[in-house]
Curated annotation (Swiss-Prot):
Other remarks in the entry: Overexpression of walK/walR reduces susceptibility against vancomycin.
Variant or mutagenesis effect after changing residue 53 to A: Loss of phosphorylation by WalK
Pfam family, one: Response_reg
Compartment(s): Cytoplasm
SUPFAM superfamilies, sorted: C-terminal effector domain of the bipartite response regulators, CheY-like
Main location: cytoplasm
Entry's Gene Ontology cellular component terms: cytosol; protein-DNA complex
UniProt DNA-binding region: 132-231
Domain Response regulatory: 4-117
InterPro entries: CheY-like_superfamily (IPR011006), OmpR/PhoB-type_DNA-bd (IPR001867), Resp_reg_WalR (IPR047791), Sig_transdc_resp-reg_C-effctor (IPR016032), Sig_transdc_resp-reg_receiver (IPR001789), WalR-like (IPR039420), WH-like_DNA-bd_sf (IPR036388)
Keywords for the protein's UniProt record, in alphabetical order: Activator, Cytoplasm, DNA-binding, Phosphoprotein, Transcription, Transcription regulation, Two-component regulatory system
UniProt protein name: Transcriptional regulatory protein WalR
Length: 233
C-alpha cells in the first residue's frame, strides 16, 4: 500500500509541484492550502507524513503542528523561510521532526521524506527465545522492541526521534558523541551542518526524563564536543 503524504502550503504552485513529484515516487498525496483545512485533512486521511509550511492563513504551521501532535506521531517536515532560525527551533520544540528551507530542491525534499519514513516506520528486530533486550540505567528502563521507556515504573512518552536518540546514547554509554555524528547516525542523513536540531531534541528529552533538567543526571553535555549518557552504578 502506498504511503500517504499531506502537503500543506498556501502557495498553490509549490504544492502542485510537490504533489506531482511525490506522486511520481509512488505516494498518495493530499493537499491543503490553509491551516484550518490542514488539520481537518490530517485528521481525515491520517497520513504517514506531513509537509507543513509555517506561514499559512487561518492557523499557522506552528499551531497546526501543536494540534496534530496531540493525537498523532507521524513525521512532520516544516517548510521554513531561508533565514527564519527562530521558526526552525520553535518547530522542532513543538514536535516537528525535520525542516527544509525555502527555496528548496524538490530532490532534497523527497530524500528527506524517504529518510523520515524509513526511520519512523522501521521495525525493531524481534527478540528470540527468552533473551531480553531491556537496558537499565539507574531508575530508567529502555524497552527497544517496544520502542518505549519507563522511569520508576511510569511510562515516559517520547516521540520516535527522541526514543531513537536516547536509545543510541544508551548503546554507547559514557561515550561522548558529537552533534554531527548524532545527526548522521540517528537522523540518518546530512543536515548540512545545522546541529541545532540535536540540541533541541536533547532539551526535549531532558525535560521528560530528568528530575531537574537544568542539572541533568542522565544526558550530560561535554562543552564544545557533544553529549553522552552518564553511567550509573
Amino acid at each position: 500500500m502506498a504511503r500517504k503524504v499531506v502537503v500543506v502550503d498556501d502557495e498553490k504552485p509549490i504544492a502542485d509541484i510537490l504533489e506531482f513529484n511525490l506522486k511520481k515516487e509512488g505516494y498518495d498525496v493530499y493537499c491543503a492550502y490553509d491551516g484550518n483545512d490542514a488539520v481537518d485533512l490530517i485528521y481525515e486521511e491520517e497520513p504517514d507524513i506531513v509537509l507543513l509550511d509555517i506561514m499559512l492563513p487561518g492557523r499557522d504551521g506552528m499551531e497546526v503542528c501543536r494540534e496534530v501532535r496531540k493525537k498523532y506521531e507521524m513525521p512532520i517536515i516544516m517548510l521554513t523561510a531561508k533565514d527564519s532560525e527562530i521558526d526552525k527551533v520553535l518547530g522542532l520544540e513543538l514536535g516537528a521532526d525535520d525542516y527544509v528551507t525555502k527555496p528548496f530542491s524538490t530532490r532534497e525534499l523527497i530524500a528527506r521524506v524517504k529518510a523520515n519514513l524509513r526511520r519512523h516506520y522501521s521495525q525493531p528486530a524481534q527478540d528470540t527465545g527468552n533473551v531480553t533486550n531491556e537496558i537499565t540505567i539507574k531508575d530508567i528502563v529502555i524497552y527497544p522492541d517496544a520502542y518505549s521507556i519507563k522511569k520508576r515504573g511510569e511510562d515516559i512518552e517520547l516521540t520516535h526521534r527522541e526514543f531513537e536518540l536516547f536509545h543510541y546514547l544508551s548503546k554507547h554509554m559514557g561515550q561522548v558523541m558529537t552533534r554531527e555524528h548524532l545527526l548522521q547516525t540517528v537522523w540518518g542523513y546530512d543536515y548540512f551542518g545545522d546541529v541545532r536540531t540535536v540540541d533541541v531534541t536533547i532539551r526535549r528529552l531532558r525535560e521528560k526524563i530528568e528530575d531537574d533538567p537544568s542539572h541533568p543526571e542522565y544526558i550530560v553535555t561535554r562543552r564544545g564536543v557533544g553529549y553522552f549518557l552518564q553511567q550509573h552504578e
